[in-house]
């Protein structure tokens, strides 16, 4: 029996290595794992911009940059970033501009066996479909967060005309795709409810993962801790986007109730300025910007307890990928998120942390008090989480799932 020929795949994504966005880390590893399986991959992405919301030094000067790799190619285009993260219109126009330019760039290169397009931004659905029309490979639409649901839930989008357009774009993108991949059963139910019954079998769950060789448990006494002026006291850490989807007011309330601990918010986003102003009278709260990728394991090791807070309703439309990274670092998770959704299920299965209802300061602080009171138990949670993630979130397994999905689309299954 002869082996099937290697696949030729086009990948359209808003971030790719060396960009530091979590979704960029995920898709970069998937691409490298697909290449390790012998496949040819051609990536169309943005110039690196995520950390400061501006194109990184050394990458400017051209709207389109192309490079050949051992496994295919990378085409990077201008993402039209805006430094004002609170200006939603400016950000939306940037997404549209990036989607259009990446779409034009993706039309080069001949026929492929599949087009994998990653959302958000939701506009990549139409970009992927246009690429499919020219390059003939079936469209696989990968959903990291369900949009516009998350934006509507948080009140980031309230204009009914904008919501109607976004819903239309979402519906069209799902129906044009040969397959839609989501991260959890909750997201599958959400997407399946928006497509016709005959198309629901096209929605597949392929979870995210973490690089457990890169992120490993390490000593809590890190240089990062020293840089922030923190001693040996317990550190409660939030790392990630500082936006309106995250209930970061819980962090400040906990800081008021637990002056013996230091609370670190590591990241940036539209809500950081207001959150930092609100924390001005809290001496046990530290803020720091995104760190380079190579420092991520060190940042994670700094925290004794890590936080995953999402506002009510968002646990059903989003699976924070940071949860996998925290577990890989051997640290316990305290999640404030909708019960019965993917993160609480993950923590229950792994023993790697606890979950409380969202937006409930008393429940949040009660759970944190228990974790702070028993360092030995929190260390055991961290070890259990690491053990679970080693077996449940393999990059190679995720790449094989995409390979099998594309093979199935080729054969009409």
Where in this protein do the model-derived segments appear?
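Nucleotide-activated donor-binding/catalytic signature segment of Leloir-type glycosyltransferases, i.e.
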Residues: 264, 273-297
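N-terminal subdomain of nucleotide-sugar transferases
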Residues: 1-70
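Carbohydrate-associated surface elements
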Residues: 186, 209
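Nucleotide-sugar-dependent
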Residues: 246, 290-301, 306-327, 332-345
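Membrane-proximal helix-turn-helix segments that form the acceptor-binding/catalytic region
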Residues: 123-126, 130-134, 160-182
């Amino acid at each position: 029996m002869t082996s099937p020929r290697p696949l030729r795949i086009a990948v359209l994504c808003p971030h790719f290595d060396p960009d530091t966005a979590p979704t960029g880390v995920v898709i970069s590893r998937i691409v490298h794992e697909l290449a390790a399986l012998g496949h040819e991959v051609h990536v169309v992405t943005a110039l690196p911009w995520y950390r400061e919301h501006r194109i990184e030094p050394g990458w400017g000067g051209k709207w389109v940059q192309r490079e050949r790799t051992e496994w295919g190619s990378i085409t990077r285009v201008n993402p039209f970033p805006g430094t004002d993260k609170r200006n939603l219109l400016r950000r939306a126009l940037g997404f549209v501009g990036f989607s259009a330019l990446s779409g034009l760039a993706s039309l080069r290169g001949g026929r492929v066996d599949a087009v994998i397009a990653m959302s958000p931004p939701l506009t990549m659905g139409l970009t992927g479909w246009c690429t499919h029309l020219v390059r003939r490979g079936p469209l696989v639409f990968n959903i990291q967060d369900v949009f516009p649901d998350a934006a509507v839930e948080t009140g980031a989008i309230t204009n009914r005309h904008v919501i109607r357009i976004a819903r239309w774009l979402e519906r069209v993108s799902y129906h044009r795709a040969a397959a839609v991949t989501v991260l959890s059963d909750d997201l599958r139910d959400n997407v399946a409810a928006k497509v016709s019954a005959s198309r629901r079998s096209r929605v597949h769950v392929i979870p995210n993962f973490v690089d457990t060789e890169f992120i490993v448990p390490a000593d809590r006494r890190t240089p990062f801790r020293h840089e922030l002026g923190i001693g040996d006291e317990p550190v409660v850490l939030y790392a990630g986007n500082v936006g309106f989807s995250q209930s970061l007011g819980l962090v400040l309330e906990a800081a008021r109730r637990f002056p013996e601990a230091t609370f670190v918010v590591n990241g940036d986003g539209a809500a950081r300025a207001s959150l930092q102003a609100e924390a001005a009278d809290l001496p046990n709260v530290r803020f720091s910007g995104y760190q380079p990728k190579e420092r991520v394991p060190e940042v994670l090791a700094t925290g004794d307890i890590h936080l995953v807070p999402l506002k009510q309703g968002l646990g059903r439309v989003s699976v924070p990928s940071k949860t996998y990274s925290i577990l890989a670092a051997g640290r316990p998770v305290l999640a404030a998120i909708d019960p019965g959704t993917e993160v609480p299920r993950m923590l229950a299965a792994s023993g790697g942390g606890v979950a409380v209802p969202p937006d409930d300061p008393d429940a949040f602080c009660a759970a944190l008090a228990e974790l702070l009171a028993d360092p030995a138990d929190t260390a055991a949670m961290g070890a259990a989480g690491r053990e679970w993630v080693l077996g449940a979130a393999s990059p190679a397994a995720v790449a094989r799932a995409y390979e099998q999905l594309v093979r199935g689309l080729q054969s009409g299954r």
